[in-house]
């Protein structure tokens, strides 16, 4: 008999369906995991074994085979621990397979059986909702999952603190309380543009850039107030709508930076250092993660000392500014992240992915031809600050 449990694989901001298949058959005792697992997934054998031992369960002295299907899709991350454990428990007859058929399971297991958070739960909840299934996830991320899978659509969310509580709930001896969607964080108060004295021309340009979602080039001598004005931009942008907040939170969830499942209505503000690499700015790495331009989705990306960025890094901005997407190509996958610059006030055609103004600071002749090529991709407000306007700041 083969037991089946549904889970997901993350490819950028896309969740692919994965089926965890478990077979317990006579033969030489062993625990075999196949289906292109990475090192983190391969180590789940030890975590699952230790978690079951903490529950007082022992693996049967048989040949255990776990297959992550489809086998040609790379599997990365520790969120496979929980579905692997549930599939194994189903094959051992501890839990009824029919009770797991309508759920997607994600979560990492601690050695004592606790279900601990893993990145991407919000994306898994979206996938579960689209496939009309419930979601089994860590208790610490239940409020995060409830933004999508709970509430009016009736899709259940089982937020389990540990494996024992989850099994007791499935057996009917314990009831896991449905999690409530986490309250949206209040918009934090940053620098107030009204408190900046002088620089009326600069402040007017800032307002125009915010209203029209224009890129803005700020050039001037040190101490002119360019960085201060740039930090004031999020304060004059409107709050994120519920749909926009969900989009921003999905990116944060995949990156593992969403705190306590709380959806934020504040516009993201990212200010990478000029030594940032291409992978840091556009996304990449061994396990592809969103870069700074995607983390600024629907928000502000402030590039201070722009000419000090490496030429190759600046060149990597051309396509995102033109197409509104960042595609990271790897040998085993092509991952696309959002990087759209678009007016939230509907001046232009509304697209799915938006990002408010990109700031360029301290422009000069270094890499000039390349910089102007980048800037000409979109309407740009070019502002030259004069120190004479700084009196009283």
Describe each region flagged by the PLM.
Residues 1-228, 310, 322, 327-330:
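Peripheral, non-AAA+ core regions of ATP-driven protein-machinery
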Residues 174-208, 212, 243-294:
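P-loop NTPase nucleotide-binding/switch module
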Residues 218-257:
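Walker A/P-loop
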Residues 220, 283, 305:
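The Walker A (P-loop) glycine that initiates the GxxxxGKT/S ATP-binding motif of P-loop NTPases
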Residues 269-272, 289-298, 329-346:
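AAA+/SF3 P-loop NTPase mechanochemical coupling elements
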Residues 287, 315-337, 355, 365:
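Substrate-gripping "pore-loop 1 plus following alpha2 helix"
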Residues 290-321:
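Conserved AAA+/SF3 P-loop NTPase catalytic/coupling segment centered on the Walker-B
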Residues 345-393:
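N-terminal low-complexity segments that are often proline-rich with Ser/Thr-Pro
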């Amino acid at each position: 008999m083969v037991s089946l449990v549904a889970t997901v694989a993350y490819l950028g901001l896309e969740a692919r369906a994965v089926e965890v298949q478990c077979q317990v058959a006579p033969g030489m005792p062993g625990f075999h995991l196949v289906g292109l697992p990475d090192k983190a997934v391969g180590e789940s054998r030890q975590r699952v074994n230790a978690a079951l031992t903490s529950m007082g369960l022992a693996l049967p002295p048989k040949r255990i085979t776990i297959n992550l299907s489809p086998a040609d899709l790379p599997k990365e991350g520790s969120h496979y621990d929980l579905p692997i454990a549930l599939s194994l428990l189903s094959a051992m007859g501890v839990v009824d397979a029919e009770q797991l058929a309508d759920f997607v399971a994600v979560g990492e297991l601690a050695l004592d059986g606790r279900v601990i958070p893993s990145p991407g739960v919000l994306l898994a909840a979206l996938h579960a909702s689209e496939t009309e299934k419930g979601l089994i996830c860590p208790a610490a991320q239940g409020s995060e999952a409830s933004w999508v899978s709970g509430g009016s659509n009736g899709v259940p969310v089982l937020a389990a603190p540990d494996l024992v509580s989850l099994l007791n709930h499935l057996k009917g001896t314990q009831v896991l309380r449905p999690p409530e969607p986490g309250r949206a964080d209040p918009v934090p108060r940053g620098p107030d543009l009204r408190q900046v004295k002088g620089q009326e021309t600069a402040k007017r340009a800032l307002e125009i850039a915010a209203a029209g979602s224009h890129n803005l080039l700020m050039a001037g001598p040190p101490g002119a107030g360019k960085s201060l004005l740039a930090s004031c931009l999020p304060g004059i942008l409107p709050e994120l709508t519920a749909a926009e907040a969900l989009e921003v939170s999905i990116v944060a969830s995949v990156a593992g930076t969403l705190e306590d499942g709380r959806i934020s209505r504040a516009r993201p503000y990212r200010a990478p250092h000029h030594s940032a690499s291409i992978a840091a700015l556009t996304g990449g790495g061994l396990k592809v993660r969103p870069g700074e331009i995607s983390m600024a989705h629907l928000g502000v990306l402030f590039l201070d000392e722009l000419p000090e960025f490496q030429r190759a890094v600046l060149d990597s901005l051309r396509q995102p500014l033109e197409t509104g997407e960042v595609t990271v190509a790897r040998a085993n996958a092509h991952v696309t992240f959002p990087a759209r610059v678009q007016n939230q006030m509907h001046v232009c055609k509304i697209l799915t992915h938006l990002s408010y103004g990109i700031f360029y600071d301290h422009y000069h002749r270094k890499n000039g031809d390349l910089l102007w090529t980048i800037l000409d991709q979109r309407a740009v407000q070019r502002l030259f600050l004069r120190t004479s306007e700084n009196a009283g700041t």
